From Swiss-Prot:
This protein is one of the early assembly proteins of the 50S ribosomal subunit, although it is not seen to bind rRNA by itself. It is important during the early stages of 50S assembly. Belongs to the universal ribosomal protein uL13 family. It holds the Pfam family Ribosomal_L13. GO terms for biological process: negative regulation of translation; translation. Part of the 50S ribosomal subunit. GO terms for cellular component: cytosolic large ribosomal subunit. It comes from Shigella dysenteriae serotype 1 (strain Sd197). Keywords: Ribonucleoprotein, Ribosomal protein. The keyword Ribonucleoprotein applies. This is Large ribosomal subunit protein uL13. GO terms for molecular function: mRNA binding; structural constituent of ribosome.
Length: 142
């Protein structure tokens, strides 16, 4: 018996929609990363992108535990000398709530071209509306 290896052209990808209202950020991101990689499927292959497309709604209503709302700090560098920037979780939620979930999930995906391809299948929206109705996404309860 031969070991099964998924081929990129034969992988079937579904579309799912997830509501992030009241969900804990880390627990939500863990499940999203797992599904983006395709580890929930029987035909999972580490070197092939077998994951599904996921739409996340209400990113501005995601929850964190403890004092992370005020204490968690996100850093990024502009590339210029002395260009380190920082923002707290509250500031990120106020300015760009989608980035909070994108950063959390991206850190849980593989680094490299395959991980970037997986992260492109994540669509995050701050509100309750999305423009992917043509894909007929199924509701995913996490």
């Amino acid at each position: 018996m031969k070991t099964f290896t998924a081929k990129p052209e034969t992988v079937k990808r579904d579309w799912y929609v997830v509501d992030a209202t009241g969900k804990t950020l880390g627990r939500l991101a863990t499940e999203l990363a797992r599904r983006l990689r395709g580890k929930h499927k029987a035909e999972y292959t580490p070197h092939v992108d077998t994951g599904d497309y996921i739409i996340v709604l209400n990113a501005d209503k995601v929850a964190v535990t403890g004092n992370k709302r005020t204490d968690k700090v996100y850093y990024h560098h502009t590339g210029h000398i002395g260009g380190i920037k920082q923002a707290t979780f509250e500031e990120m939620i106020a300015r760009r709530p989608e980035r909070v979930i994108e950063i959390a999930v991206k850190g849980m995906l593989p680094k490299g071209p395959l991980g970037r391809a997986m992260s492109r299948k994540l669509k995050v929206y701050a509100g309750n509306e999305h423009n992917h109705a043509a894909q007929q996404p199924q509701v995913l309860d996490i």
